[in-house]
Amino acid sequence: MKKIDLNADIAEGFPFDESLLQLLSSANVACGLHAGGAKEMQSAVKFAKENKVRIGAHPSFPDRENFGRTAMALSSQELIAHLRYQLGALKAICDGEGAVISYVKPHGALYNQAAKDEKIARLIAQTVYQFDPNLKLMGLAGSLMLRIAEEEKLQTISEVFADRHYMPDGSLVPRSQPNAMVESDKEAIQQVLQMVTKGQVNAIDGSLVPVKAESICLHGDNQHSLQFAKRIVEELEKNHIKITA
């Protein structure tokens, strides 16, 4: 039986976390610098533990104004400090709830920059390894960030996206472009099944791009995305694909 992990971002202040956590096998907990805060983090950890969902830290650039989606030119020391601050905050909450952090997935612009920028990717990997060498790093399948993480002796999780279109090089179509998102639920489900069962995805130019699908990113920031997440779960189960971290 094939297996796949389902992850989504939580503790970002949206009202669907509890419902979403009943569908997921992994939860990316926002650490307060792009959205959410201590209260949201603690609730998310509590719900994740109750639902036996694997917990990941979801650190970002310090950018609440733009939801962490704007690239920032931080010095190495600034980036390291912000990463340590966020990881430490989530660890303290997990310790208090008797839970553990299992992996780290950068958020938004930090995720996208690390997928292509060796310096940022290495700083993230080294900071995570120093914080806890047993943590895994989740990132875009086939990206530079995952290759650097493996060089830095971290285990990795290759992530694919249900609702994003892909470039021929395997990167995501930037959100600034009009065709960045997969708008049709039917198309997104077909894309998920193709990635999980065949290890490939159709790029926007029609070419087939190989992808290693270990975790599927879903979104749960509105009512439609929550319903879509339920449909993805149903389709995976219908195709005898087990959802597990």
From Swiss-Prot:
Forms a complex composed of PxpA, PxpB and PxpC. Catalyzes the cleavage of 5-oxoproline to form L-glutamate coupled to the hydrolysis of ATP to ADP and inorganic phosphate. GO terms for molecular function: 5-oxoprolinase (ATP-hydrolyzing) activity; ATP binding. InterPro entries: Glyco_hydro/deAcase_b/a-brl (IPR011330), LamB/YcsF/PxpA-like (IPR005501). The keyword Nucleotide-binding applies. The keyword Nucleotidyltransferase does not apply. Pfam families: LamB_YcsF. GO terms for biological process: carbohydrate metabolic process. It catalyses: 5-oxo-L-proline + ATP + 2 H2O = L-glutamate + ADP + phosphate + H(+). Its EC number is 3.5.2.9. It is an enzyme of class 3 (hydrolase). Gene3D superfamilies: Glycoside hydrolase/deacetylase (3.20.20.370). Keywords: ATP-binding, Hydrolase, Nucleotide-binding. HAMAP family: PxpA. This is 5-oxoprolinase subunit A. Belongs to the LamB/PxpA family.
